């Protein structure tokens, strides 16, 4: 099911973790790693636009633009060189790709040819983003049509998965990749549903158990109540789960615009990787 994995790297503190999770998944699934770094052309476009539209128009010189492009290209090459050394040492199958363009567009386009995307929760400007998820990752999680593993700065060998399940179509799609990953990584799954209605919760959990049965992995179930994002992240933290798996963006866009989405909140608050199923 997972034979190729896209690793989005930018040289930030998250790059090493993206590589480590990629290596772990690649070895478990015998999957090819496609390592991608993007030279962000928006930097040049912003510089020109800001200069032209300013109160006192000042356009950056051609020399400045050329030197900036050269520096970014060299940095991207250095990132890929370091990735190459690590992956060769780990004896993984891999490809390296350096592409210029808007990061969101490039990542989503490259994701069309893989089964899974692994990306850091924040990028090279993380120090200024506080606890908010990066603008690039937020857009990619919405626009990318492939499942994603969103990781933080620390790598932990996965030992158990918390699967958030509510019986919705999006959550149901997450069962497949969660079962597959648990089987390949040889780790158990706990299926968690958030509801104040115990009988409904038990019915939802029975459905998940029945689906996951053929994967022949350890399965446990749990019911919690409260705000979904807080309950899921809190349960994962209290019980020391290493991955949270869930369907992506289950609410209407109108509701998300007003209240925010559970998906975004869980990515922001979680201290462990989040597996988003598409």
Predicted features by range, described:
Residues 79-94, 215:
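A structural motif corresponding to the C-terminal end of an alpha-helix
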Residues 12, 100-103, 168, 226-228:
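Short beta->alpha connector loops
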Residues 43, 104-106, 128, 158, ...:
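Generic structural signal for helix capping and beta-alpha/helix-loop junctions
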Residues 69, 73-81, 175, 202-206:
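Short, surface-exposed alpha-helical segments at coil->helix boundaries
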Residues 1-62, 90, 143, 156-223, ...:
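Small/aliphatic-rich secondary-structure junction motif
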Residues 209, 227-237:
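A short, acidic, amphipathic alpha-helical segment used as a generic capping/interface helix at domain edges
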Residues 15-27, 96, 102-154, 235-278:
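Gly/Ser-rich helix-loop-strand patches that form or flank binding pockets
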Residues 60-71:
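Short glycine/proline- and acidic residue-enriched helix-loop micro-motifs
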């Amino acid at each position: 099911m997972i034979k190729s994995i896209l690793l989005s790297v930018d040289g930030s503190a998250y790059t090493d973790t993206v590589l480590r999770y990629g290596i772990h998944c690649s070895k478990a699934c015998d999957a090819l790693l496609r390592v991608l770094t993007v030279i962000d052309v928006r930097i040049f476009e912003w510089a020109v636009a800001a200069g032209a539209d300013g109160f006192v128009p000042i356009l950056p010189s051609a020399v400045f633009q050329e030197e900036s492009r050269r520096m970014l290209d060299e940095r991207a090459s250095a990132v890929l060189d370091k990735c190459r050394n690590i992956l060769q040492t780990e004896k993984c199958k891999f490809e390296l790709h350096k592409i210029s363009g808007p990061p969101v567009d490039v990542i989503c386009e490259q994701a069309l040819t893989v089964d899974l995307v692994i990306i850091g929760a924040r990028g090279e400007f993380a120090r200024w983003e506080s606890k908010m998820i990066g603008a690039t990752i937020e857009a990619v999680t919405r626009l990318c049509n492939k499942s994603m593993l969103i990781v933080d700065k620390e790598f932990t060998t996965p030992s158990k998965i918390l699967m958030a399940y509510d019986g919705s179509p999006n959550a149901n799609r997450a069962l497949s990749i969660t079962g597959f990953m648990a089987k390949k990584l040889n780790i158990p799954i706990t299926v968690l549903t958030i509801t104040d209605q115990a009988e409904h919760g038990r019915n939802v959990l029975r459905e998940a158990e029945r689906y996951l049965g053929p994967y022949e992995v350890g399965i446990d179930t749990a019911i919690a109540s409260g705000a979904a994002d807080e309950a899921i992240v809190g349960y994962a933290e209290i019980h020391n789960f290493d991955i949270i798996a869930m369907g992506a963006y289950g609410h209407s866009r109108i509701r998300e615009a007003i209240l925010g989405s559970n998906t975004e909140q869980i990515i922001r608050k979680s201290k462990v990787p989040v597996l988003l199923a598409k």
